[in-house]
């Protein structure tokens, strides 16, 4: 990735942040700003809200498969987001990291009616925290350049420590001018241009009433030269953002398993300690005109131990209405409406336009706190964490299509070998139908290899799997 470096400019500078919310037209209630603190809170309270996702992939049998969820080809983060290799002059290959769970974009919001300083640290005992912004004071485990660029870093006992974080409420940026309308307009212009510009997915998460977070990048013991771009990394800069962001990959079990039978019907079994407040089944299919069609159904509750079967799914004819349904579920879990809409806007493309079958449910907060302990000092009066589990499932028909693609590739390979008359042949490109699966192509090939009946298909699946893995390691 060709990194670009930005300095925090004065408030009056034009940094042009794009505040994009594509998920749905705001409701009438949304036109008014969220009340920063709940009615039961005092003006001195600190409220913390967080949302994010855990993504897994399984075959129709429900067994979760390893994949390489962080390959650069599938990353959509702005250049200013930091990673573990930053400052080491290292072309760190995230594509070498394998895991069963991708932890995507947890963003942590802070609500306060006065400026204050806090300390923030997050731990991931069974994972590796790989990317973050603003910069942290320290992270564990220490980055090992040799391991990170060869076999891939070990997953486990990871943490990020932002150290001291200054919180600045939006009200602090209201200009002292006599006309209230002018003051309001000027404040909005200032707020919309304070943060670094990023892509639509990242900046959508900023559309809330949360306080700004300000950090100061730590100074290294000696200047670090980036060997790739040839410039000096000069920390000590101030960073301003609307939230704390981090991402990672883990190896742990989530409480719910999804399976698909021969008819395509999807079932859930909850092996956790608490019932779930609902789950959505979403299918995105390729339409007759080539555009994706969206199908959905929902179960109101997923009890512990008893299988739950989805009916449907049913064609979504009004996407905005469906997005509102998702927003309502997130709000019922404790998020503010603007936060819920920001989350849906962030994930709209990935959740609702990528071809496939997926189940969504909200992880109980007790489970989130165990998987991903968050420490904030002083302790907030309220902490709400809503992590959405996304279970990507290969249906029987999906598995059949992948097997057919692999079989066709095997036939074409045999024909090329015959035509070459014993001469060496060049490696053919991976079939487009497999590449269309993105980061899920690797586990799909692994699943196909395990269920294929013909030896030629198993052999071809192995070849394609090796080819894909080699390509991912170079990205």
Description of each model-found segment:
Residues 1-9:
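Bacterial N-terminal signal peptides that target proteins for export
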Residues 9-18:
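Bacterial N-terminal signal peptides
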Residues 16, 25-26:
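Intrinsic disorder/low-complexity segments
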Residues 26-475:
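Protease-labile, long low-complexity intrinsically disordered regions enriched in Pro/Ser/Thr
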Residues 20-22:
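Sec/Tat signal peptide C-region and signal peptidase I cleavage site
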């Amino acid at each position: 990735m060709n990194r670009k470096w930005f300095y925090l400019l004065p408030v009056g500078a034009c940094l042009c942040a794009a505040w994009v919310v594509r998920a749905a037209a705001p409701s009438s209630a949304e036109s008014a700003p969220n009340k920063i603190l709940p009615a039961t809170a005092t003006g001195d309270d600190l409220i913390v809200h967080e949302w994010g996702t855990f993504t897994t992939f399984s075959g129709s049998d429900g067994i979760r498969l390893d994949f390489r969820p962080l390959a650069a080809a599938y990353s959509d983060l702005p250049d200013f987001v930091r990673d573990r290799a930053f400052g080491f002059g290292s072309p760190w290959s995230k594509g070498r990291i394998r895991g069963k769970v991708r932890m995507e974009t947890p963003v942590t919001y802070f609500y306060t009616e006065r400026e204050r300083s806090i300390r923030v640290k997050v731990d991931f005992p069974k994972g590796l925290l790989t990317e973050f912004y603003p910069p942290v004071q320290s992270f564990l485990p220490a980055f090992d350049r040799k391991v990170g660029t060869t076999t891939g870093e070990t997953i486990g006992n990871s943490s990020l420590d932002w150290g001291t974080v200054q919180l600045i409420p939006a009200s602090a940026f209201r200009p002292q001018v006599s006309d209230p309308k002018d003051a309001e307009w000027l404040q909005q212009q200032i707020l919309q241009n304070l943060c670094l510009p990023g892509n639509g997915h990242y900046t959508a998460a900023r559309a809330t009433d949360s306080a700004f977070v300000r950090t100061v990048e730590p100074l290294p013991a000696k200047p670090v030269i980036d060997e790739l771009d040839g410039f000096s990394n000069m920390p000590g800069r101030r960073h301003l953002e609307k939230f704390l962001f981090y991402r990672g990959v883990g190896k742990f079990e989530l409480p719910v398993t999804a399976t698909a039978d021969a008819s395509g019907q999807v079932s859930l079994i909850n092996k956790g300690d608490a019932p779930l407040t609902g789950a959505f089944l979403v299918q995105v299919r390729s339409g007759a005109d080539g555009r994706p069609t969206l199908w959905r159904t929902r179960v109101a509750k997923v009890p512990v131990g008893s299988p739950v079967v989805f009916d449907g799914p049913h064609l979504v004819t009004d996407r905005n209405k469906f997005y509102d349904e998702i927003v309502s579920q997130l709000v019922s879990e404790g998020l503010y409406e603007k936060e819920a809409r920001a989350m849906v806007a962030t994930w709209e493309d990935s959740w609702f336009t990528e071809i496939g079958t997926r189940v969504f449910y909200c992880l109980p907060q007790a489970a989130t706190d165990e998987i991903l302990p968050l420490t904030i000092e002083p302790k907030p009066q309220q902490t709400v964490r809503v992590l959405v589990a996304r279970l990507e499932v290969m249906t029987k028909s999906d598995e059949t299509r992948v097997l057919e693609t692999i079989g066709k590739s095997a036939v074409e390979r045999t024909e090329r070998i015959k035509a070459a008359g014993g001469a060496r042949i060049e490696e053919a490109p991976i079939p487009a139908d497999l590449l269309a699966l993105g980061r899920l192509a690797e586990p799909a090939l692994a699943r196909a290899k395990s269920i294929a009946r013909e030896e030629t298909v198993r052999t071809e699946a192995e070849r394609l799997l090796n080819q894909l893995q080699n390509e991912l390691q170079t990205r």
